[in-house]
Amino acid sequence: MNITIISVGKLKEKYLKLGIDEYIKRLTRYAKLNIIEIPDEKAPENLSSAEEQIVKNKEGEGILKNIKDGMYVIALDLKGKMLSSEELADKLQSLGVAGNSNIAFIIGGSLGLSEDVLKRADYKLCFSPMTFPHQLMKLILLEQIYRGLRIIKGEPYHK
């Protein structure tokens, strides 16, 4: 399985980088992993909705350029479907069985994802109705992918 994580924003916090590096190392036993960071656009606090749309569209263009033909795209979106760890494992396994071995997970910037990215997504996944910093979301996503792949292999994991 080939997994690509496309996220907006460069990771700056050292503690998150350490956690992400740990899960990248763990995941190499189960999948080929590629992480792509798209530069985030400057977004001051008081943007109009039109200005927010411009920022999301620019970030979206960078995301879409990195989605290859044939990739199954899972966008992280607050309006997406919430899954348990076991259900995520089932989703990953069913994608592999169906021949979708190239999976891209998309993490938007602080304003979310553009409509074009959401339209390109084959599936929308929500981790929680709460909002998380997108850098932290990358760590949470990697942990859940790792957990899901261990579940698929029938290996023990912490419940």
From Swiss-Prot:
| Official protein name in the record | Ribosomal RNA large subunit methyltransferase H
Gene behind this protein: rlmH
Which reaction equation describes what this protein catalyses? Answer: pseudouridine(1915) in 23S rRNA + S-adenosyl-L-methionine = N(3)-methylpseudouridine(1915) in 23S rRNA + S-adenosyl-L-homocysteine + H(+)
Where does this polypeptide localize? Cytoplasm
Q: Which PANTHER family match?
A: METHYLTRANSFERASE, RIBOSOMAL RNA LARGE SUBUNIT METHYLTRANSFERASE H
The primary location reported for this protein is cytoplasm
Assigned EC number: 2.1.1.177
The broad enzyme category this protein falls into is: transferase
Read off the Pfam families from this record: SPOUT_MTase (PF02590)
User: What is the protein's quaternary organization?
Assistant: Homodimer.
